[in-house]
């Protein structure tokens, strides 16, 4: 009777269109209920039965119900699922398998089965890659996943590495392939094998891609030749090895080991500038005036060199600081170290006066046992030898940026535009409240940015610096020359790490075209997109492995009185994030640990402060003492507590 009633259909349509709806992202809680977050201000309650239809992170459209002045959301339509491809731990066995996603807010096991053709018999505790196949909001009865890749067994000591690489879909090993002979590139190579080139690296480094030679000139000037390993002498553009390097884009450096961009035979041997081995290089000869200015007679050329010594950062630093018992093996090498230290001093002063110098942060190194256990984590401060290499590389990259810009008009450039113009007024207003007056227009120029950075560096603490960081734009990779505000330079193009950065290989090929006087093809913009994406994934992988190892390292400190100095790096509504000064671990201090009475506590991300009873008790960049309250291995999170 009512089946085809057009009035009824119209009424249903009307009711549907009049029912309020909202689109947002599902946020799960540990208590079974959840929230639909529409924006920063508005969220709706999702009752536990309705949460069964969705997953934390899903973007959905929901119907909004109002009962007794309480609004709740009923999920109706899936816009974008949170989980598509993911890693997790397998539960059950044989024909009844489920997988728990490796994510702090996803606790429920998802029924699953192995994909066809995947011949691994999954067991309880195995790690796997899975892909979602069913979702209740897509008309399916329940969630369902398919196991697409076996990662490793549950007790594997190297789980942090294998799981992280699988999560980000990154390669686990060096690329295959060999290069048997050098290409005929039509380059005339200068024979510099008689010169006392040296490399300075960590003791364990095998892929040495830069060697340095310095010479004093009669008029108080200094000459520097930077010689860089030459993988493009072996790898033709468009070849199989080139395509593999293009996809990887970078060598992936993880705690404990690296996954090279090039086959190890090339990265650690044929291209590596080993001591007492003749190697082809691409080189840059520059003259530095007394104040460290790079003069205009920059020269790029192909050469062969023979490094005369593999020097180690700490030994060189000790010797220059008159400590330790290491001595250069000859007076010629000693003279090189002295001259390179002079160049470092001059270039450091030039950058301090005319560009920007980063504050030195220590590097943290994990010392691992054979089974991946963390024996120690050591902070390695950046010392004089590190700065020698850094100044030489920055100078060489400035030279490449100039030559590529003037001769070709393109290359692979690192570009950083400073502050986002949309933030300029807010930035000026914030600085004004702290007594610094800047012009919103001027601060968007390179000179204005440098001026502000110098003022911030002169502040007694880094608090204000941390406040304005959110107004900065991100560094980008571009085929167009452009300024690098972060370094305070008009243009910056790297070519000094071609064994581990594909962009540097591209710049090598472009510089070789300049040397030969040939025309060159502008790199396609897609390559910069791939490089930016790979850089992001590699950084996330390094962070994820690090989090896992930090959790392992600090697990036995949980609940003890062991104190750690910790710098506050971020404050949010829920508490504070801190970095342990001695080892670099990130820990979280929940708000209740800061003060028991919630109403008397204000944690402000906006101001970077924690106020208790209206008084500022903590602020970002403060260093405080903490103990480790808890280490949660399943989420690799470290919970700390301030020492009262």
Curated annotation (Swiss-Prot):
Localization annotation: Cytoplasm
Task: Show the GO MF annotations.
Answer: exoribonuclease II activity; RNA binding
Q: Which GO terms describe its cellular component?
A: cytosol
**Reaction catalyzed:** Exonucleolytic cleavage in the 3'- to 5'-direction to yield nucleoside 5'-phosphates
Q: What is its main location?
A: cytoplasm
GO BP field: mRNA catabolic process
S1 motif domain sequence ranges = 561-643
Q: Which PROSITE patterns match?
A: RIBONUCLEASE_II
Q: Which Gene3D superfamilies match?
A: 2.40.50.640, Nucleic acid-binding proteins
What SUPFAM superfamilies does the database record attribute to this sequence? Nucleic acid-binding proteins
UniProt domain RNB: residue ranges: 189-516
Q: Does the keyword Plastid apply?
A: no
Q: What Enzyme Commission number does this protein have?
A: 3.1.13.1
Query: Could you tell me the keywords of this UniProt record?
Result: Cytoplasm, Exonuclease, Hydrolase, Nuclease, RNA-binding
Q: Does the keyword Nuclease apply?
A: yes
**Family annotation (HAMAP family):** RNase_II
Family listed: Belongs to the RNR ribonuclease family. RNase II subfamily.
Q: What does this protein do?
A: Involved in mRNA degradation. Hydrolyzes single-stranded polyribonucleotides processively in the 3' to 5' direction.
**UniProt-recorded name of the protein:** Exoribonuclease 2
Q: Which organism is it from?
A: Escherichia coli O17:K52:H18 (strain UMN026 / ExPEC)
Gene name of the encoded protein: rnb
């Amino acid at each position: 009777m009512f089946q085809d009633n057009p009035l009824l259909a119209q009424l249903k349509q009307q009711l549907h269109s009049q029912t309020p709806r909202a689109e947002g992202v599902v946020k799960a809680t540990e208590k079974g209920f959840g929230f639909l977050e529409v924006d920063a201000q508005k969220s709706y309650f999702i009752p536990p039965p309705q949460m069964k239809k969705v997953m934390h992170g899903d973007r959905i459209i929901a119907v909004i119900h109002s009962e007794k002045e309480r609004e709740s959301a009923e999920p109706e339509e899936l816009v974008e699922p949170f989980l598509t491809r993911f890693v997790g731990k397998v539960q059950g066995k044989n024909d009844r398998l489920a997988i728990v996603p490796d994510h702090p807010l996803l606790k429920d096991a998802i029924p699953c089965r192995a994909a066809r053709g995947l011949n691994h018999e999954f067991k309880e505790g195995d790690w796997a890659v899975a892909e979602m196949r069913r979702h209740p909001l897509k008309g399916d009865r329940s969630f369902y996943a398919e196991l697409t890749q076996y990662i490793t067994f549950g007790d594997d000591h190297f789980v942090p590495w294998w799981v992280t690489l699988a999560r980000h879909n990154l390669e686990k090993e060096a690329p295959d392939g060999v290069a048997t002979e050098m290409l005929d590139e039509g380059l005339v190579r200068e024979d510099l094998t008689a010169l006392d080139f040296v490399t300075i690296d960590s003791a364990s480094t095998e892929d040495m891609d830069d060697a340095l030679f310095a010479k004093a000139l009669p008029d108080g000037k200094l000459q520097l030749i930077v010689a860089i390993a030459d993988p493009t002498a072996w790898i033709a553009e468009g070849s199989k090895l080139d395509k593999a390097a293009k996809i990887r884009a970078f060598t992936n450096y993880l705690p404990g080991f690296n996954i090279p961009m090039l086959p190890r035979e090339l990265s650690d041997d044929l291209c590596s500038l080993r001591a007492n081995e003749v190697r082809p290089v691409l080189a840059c000869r520059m003259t530095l005036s007394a104040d460290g200015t790079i003069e205009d007679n920059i020269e790029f050329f192909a050469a062969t060199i023979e490094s005369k010594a593999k020097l180690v950062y700490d030994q060189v630093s000790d010797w220059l600081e008159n400590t330790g018992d290491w001595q250069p093996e000859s007076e010629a090498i000693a003279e090189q170290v002295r001259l390179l230290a002079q160049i470092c001093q001059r270039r450091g002063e030039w950058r301090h006066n005319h560009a920007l110098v980063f504050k030195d942060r220590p590097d943290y190194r994990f010392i691992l046992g054979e089974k991946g256990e963390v024996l120690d984590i050591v902070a390695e401060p950046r010392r004089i030898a590190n700065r020698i290499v850094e100044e030489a590389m920055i100078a060489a990259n400035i030279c490449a940026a100039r030559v590529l810009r003037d001769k070709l008009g393109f290359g692979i450039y690192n570009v950083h535009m400073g502050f986002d113009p949309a933030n300029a007024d807010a930035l000026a207003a914030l600085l004004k409240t702290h007594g610094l007056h800047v012009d919103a227009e001027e601060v968007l120029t390179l000179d204005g940015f440098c001026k502000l950075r110098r003022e911030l560096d002169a502040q007694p603490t880094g608090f204000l610096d941390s406040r304005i960081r959110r107004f900065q734009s991100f560094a980008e990779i571009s085929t167009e020359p452009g300024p690098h505000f972060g370094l305070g330079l008009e243009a910056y193009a790297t070519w000094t790490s071609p064994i581990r950065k594909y962009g540097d290989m591209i710049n090598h090929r472009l510089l070789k075209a300049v040397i030969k006087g040939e025309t060159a093809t502008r790199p396609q913009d897609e390559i910069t997109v791939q490089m930016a994406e790979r850089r992001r994934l590699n950084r996330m992988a390094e962070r994820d492995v690090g989090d896992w190892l930090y959790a392992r390292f600090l697990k036995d400190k949980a609940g003890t009185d062991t104190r750690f100095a910790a710098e506050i790096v971020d404050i949010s509504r829920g508490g504070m994030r801190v970095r342990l000064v001695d080892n670099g671990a990130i820990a979280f201090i929940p708000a209740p640990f800061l003060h028991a009475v919630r109403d008397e506590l204000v944690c402000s991300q906006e101001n970077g402060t924690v106020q208790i009873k209206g008084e500022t008790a903590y602020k970002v960049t403060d260093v405080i003492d903490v103990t480790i309250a808890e280490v949660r291995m399943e989420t690799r999170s470290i919970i700390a507590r301030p020492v009262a």
